[in-house]
Amino acid sequence: MFDSTLNPLWQRYILAVQEEVKPALGCTEPISLALAAAVAAAELEGPVERVEAWVSPNLMKNGLGVTVPGTGMVGLPIAAALGALGGNANAGLEVLKDATAQAIADAKALLAAGKVSVKIQEPCDEILFSRAKVWNGEKWACVTIVGGHTNIVHIETHNGVVFTQQACVTEGEQESPLTVLSRTTLAEILKFVNEVPFAAIRFILDSAKLNCALSQEGLSGNWGLHIGATLEKQCARGLLAKDLSSSIVIRTSAASDARMGGATLPAMSNSGSGNQGITATMPVVVVAEHFGADDERLARALMLSHLSAIYIHNQLPRLSALCAATTAAMGAAAGMAWLVDGRYETISMAISSMIGDVSGMICDGASNSCAMKVSTSASAAWKAVLMALDDTAVTGNEGIVAHDVEQSIANLCALASHSMQQTDRQIIEIMASKAR
């Protein structure tokens, strides 16, 4: 798989990126449930007549208000129904890519007939949990996903257990590539980006290809809140300058508009999130184009952005009350700073300023308004880079920012992992009361 001469640590970095940066069609929380339903349907004897599903509170939060691609409908029930009737059980986060018009119509009919239910799993200690049970008469099949959007841990039918994931790693098995990130630093990541052979990371250019196509769709269609298209119109009207700063925000938010509005184009995700992938990709692409960067330079900047975003997010719960577009934008800040300046000091200063700026942004579920937060995060990232280029940054004398960027990241992630859990519960309670 790798050149045998490649640094083993670098191999783990590349594996981590390949594991966390993947194409995804539709918001990944509803898609996780759709995948569970699709796999269950593949195990069922006969056509699906009824769907029952249970999800964690966090997954419910991120599925209440998001449009499922191709359906024009929001919410988890349509995702579960379409996954069961038209999903590709082998396609992972692109489970709905082959859904036909007939499958969509059948899913809507199943929903209208009251044959689909989605409830919160109680009790539930897992942050990311989805279980789908499909029925044909008295026959049934059930699939459970835990911990990761595609991490199937249990498959069972009326005939018995088909599959159960082993909880422990046996001797001889390799640890997850993500484990290495808990033992690395941004400085080591930068060394990797500067020195790794281009051929080993060329694949990351696919993130630019997919997310640029999504951005163009967002600008040409009436998706979501159409923030990108609206800002572009304001440039034409003379109310907003058409410059590098506005281009970063417009093209990044346009991709999120299309993503959250239900466009049937995949995003290249990061850490299980399309919006995080968009945020880690598009600002870097825009700046690279501005400076006329070639493919190799773009690939190195994208690798720094995506790997830095993964590195930070690996210290967070998979889902939390912290809007992770902000942490993905910290990766983007690193990638943009590298393109302009290349120095570790500039990169670390930009990330520190980001932590001092947007770290309080909450995640109140996946919806069209995510594009607002994506645009805010992208704008903050470029502002932080501009400050760092002038040797200015939020310092360790201010707020949760420390004198060392690694400690600043740890402080932010500690907030999200511990004290913001109560915030998360309050957000879920508010959203649940609206849905009643």
UniProtKB/Swiss-Prot annotation:
InterPro entries (UniProt xref): Ser_deHydtase-like_asu, UPF0597
Swiss-Prot/TrEMBL GO biological process terms: L-cysteine catabolic process to pyruvate
Pfam families per the UniProt record, alphabetical: SDH_alpha
Regions crossing the membrane: none
GO molecular function terms noted in the UniProt entry: L-cysteine desulfhydrase activity
Family named by the database record: Belongs to the UPF0597 family.
Entry protein name: UPF0597 protein YhaM
Organism, as annotated: Escherichia coli O6:H1 (strain CFT073 / ATCC 700928 / UPEC)
Lineage of the organism: Bacteria, Pseudomonadati, Pseudomonadota, Gammaproteobacteria, Enterobacterales
Gene: yhaM
